[in-house]
Every structure is written in C-alpha cells, then in structure tokens.
Amino acid sequence: MPSFRTLLSALLACTFLHTLAAADELTKLTFGVVPQQSASKLANKWSPILKRISEETGIQISFATAPSIPLFEKKLSEGDYDLAYMNPLHYTFYSQSPGYVAIAKQANKKIRGIIVAQKDAKITSLDDLDNTSMAFPAPLSFAATVLPRAELKGQDIQIKPHYVKSHDSVYRSIAMGLYPAGGGIERTFDLVEPETKSQLKILWKTKGYTPHAIAAHPRISASQRRQIQSALLNLNNSEEGRELLSALQFSGIDSASDADWNDVRALNYSVK
C-alpha cells in the first residue's frame, strides 16, 4: 500500500504539472483579420463577435489587422497573430510555417473570385481585357488575384496587374475609372458601399473553393482551441449570434480541419 509520503508526492507533482499547463495558456489573444476592407469597417463587424467569444471563454480576444494584405502576410509568416482569419491560399502556406491550425470556416460557402468592370464600359468578355491594366488587391489574394490571373493567362489574355492593397480599393478605383476592370470576391463585392457597387458589373466568376480559414497559432493550447471553436460554433445557436454573423455575410460557422483546404493545395500554387 502506498505510504502517505508517496501519495503526497504524487499529489504535489500533479498540482505542479497542472500549474505549468495553466501557465502555458494565454489569457490575452490577438485575432488578425485579412484587410480586404478598411480597418474601421472590419473592426465594426468583427469586434462584437470577438467580444461574445471572449465572454464565453473567459479569454480576452482583441481585433487586429494590418494596413495592407502584404503586411498582413508578413505578420502571419512571423506568427504575430494568436488567431487569424486568412484566405485559403494563406492557410496552405502558413499552416506549414509557422504552423497555424484551422478551427473554423464559413458555413455553406465556397469562395469564388470575380472580375468586375465598369457597368457602362464597353467590356463584355474577358477578351476585351487584352493589353489592359487591371486592379488587384495583392499578389497572394487567392480568389481575387490568383484565380482570375490564372484564367486570363490560360486564355492568353495579356494584362498588367496593379496591386491596390484591398478589395474595396479595387472596386473604388474601377468605379472612378482608374482601371477598366479588376479582381475581387462575391462577399466583399456584396459589402461594398452602394454608390460604388451601382457603377460596377460582374464580368466573370471562378469555380468554388473552400473559403477563408479561422486558424490558431500553435502556441495556443489544444484546450483553448477547443474552447474558442466551441464559442464560434455557438454563434449558430442564438438569434444574437446569427445576427453578428450576418454582418459578415455569413450564414453560419462550421468546424474545420486542415484537410478541408486540400482542394486549394491541389492547385500546386507557389510564390515565384
């Protein structure tokens, strides 16, 4: 029969290990959002969701973004964000290094890239874009840049890309007549201000792919990932939660695993 001293030693060891595990869990986390739109617009849409998740988990989660998509990519590569909402191509890169782990994604959604043009412009097909300049958010914007440019290249349509840092900047620059056309995605096109959207038309759409990932940096413990994932999924279960999601044009949130983005990996895209 174990002696009292042995039992006491075991109890102290368990307590010590539990204390170490608790110390490893962070109480303040940053949630980085890809800057497809202005920081103020993104903060208005995401901060109420993060507040709700913070209240449910007891973990303080604060909104963060970057001035441009390339700077956001740099922060992801350096692991600056504890949690992040990133495009599908970003996820395939940054799940490798620094090792972000997918926990959730938009429900009932496939992301599609679009090419938009001025509504009154005499552009009716992709062929009309040959030898023009086009606006795109950033080189690694998956659906808004990579997919449209691949299609144009496949049709031997020569264009000169100009990177204007965000989706909203693409739409506004086309509406202002700075470019005849540019790349975006359906969700951000639907969210752009009506006075801009009314001047644009969708010229072409890509096929659908797994949408953006909500992912956690590997320094976030598995138990905290489960807590945050559960809180995200719980948004589906209340009217208030569904209203918060609707501000993002989300019909709901699904759990996610790394393999969900194998359709994007199958494109074998690499940065040249």
At which residue positions do the language-model features occur?
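Bacterial N-terminal signal peptides
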Residues: S9-H18
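Short loop->beta-strand "edge-of-pocket" segments that line small-molecule binding or catalytic clefts
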Residues: L29-Q36, L42, D127-A144
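Bacterial N-terminal signal peptides that target proteins for export
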Residues: M1-L8
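Glycine/small-residue-rich loop that forms an oxyanion/phosphate-binding "nest" at active or ligand-binding sites
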Residues: T92-A117
